[in-house]
Design a protein with these regions (language model features):
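Small-residue-enriched, tightly packed secondary-structure blocks
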Residues: 31-190
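Bacterial N-terminal signal peptides that target proteins for export
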Residues: 2-15
């Protein structure tokens, strides 16, 4: 009888997924204000400068940067990921975005990570901003930067239209990809 409940009841699985994700979320993280998002983005940028050697070169060379701090992923067979962040151009926030992705397969656990996408060309930035829901790998290819020994970033990717970093990962799921990540503009007021 127990086996039938676990194998046939998707509600149980969804409840467990929600429970795992909730364990990693601050109580108000799903309803952040613009001010709260900006504060989290500022902290993530400071972490980026501290953890990634050569970070300044990416910031200076980019036309804009999407900063998604504390993106949370939880999984128990079915996985989900969510986070909110800001697009900054010239050091100022111009728009707010969320990222959502889902997956099915053998997986269990949870993690939190920071994501920064650098738009290195005006065309890549324009296409991102015009999109209703921009998906990594579909609407634009992201060159994920590997951080070498001593925390130094490989700056040869500066010539790619979109460069991505996944850093400050904490948790039990070692996932540094952006596969399936969808970024959607939010309607947030100051």
């Amino acid at each position: 009888m127990k086996k039938a409940i676990w194998s046939n009841n998707w509600l149980v699985r969804l409840f467990l997924l929600f429970t795992v994700i909730s364990a990693f979320l601050p109580s108000n993280s799903l309803a952040k204000t613009a001010k709260e998002i900006d504060a989290s983005v500022d902290v993530a940028i400071k972490r980026f400068y501290k953890q990634v050697g050569g970070a300044e070169e990416f910031v200076k060379a980019s036309k804009g940067m999407l900063v998604m701090p504390n993106v949370v992923k939880g999984a128990f067979i079915v996985g989900g990921e969510y986070g909110e962040g800001a697009l900054r151009i010239g050091g100022k926030t111009v728009d707010y975005y969320n990222t959502i992705s889902g997956s099915i397969g053998f997986q269990i656990g949870g993690e939190s990570k920071d994501i920064i996408l650098f738009f290195m060309t005006d065309e890549a930035l324009k296409k991102f901003r015009a999109s209703e829901g921009w998906e990594a790998g579909v609407d634009g290819n992201v060159a994920l930067v590997s951080v070498g020994a001593g925390g130094r970033a490989d700056t040869t990717t500066l010539k790619d239209p979109i460069v991505g970093f996944v850093f400050d990962a904490k948790g039990l799921i070692a996932d540094i990809s952006l596969k399936g990540a969808k970024f959607t503009k939010l309607d947030k007021k100051e």
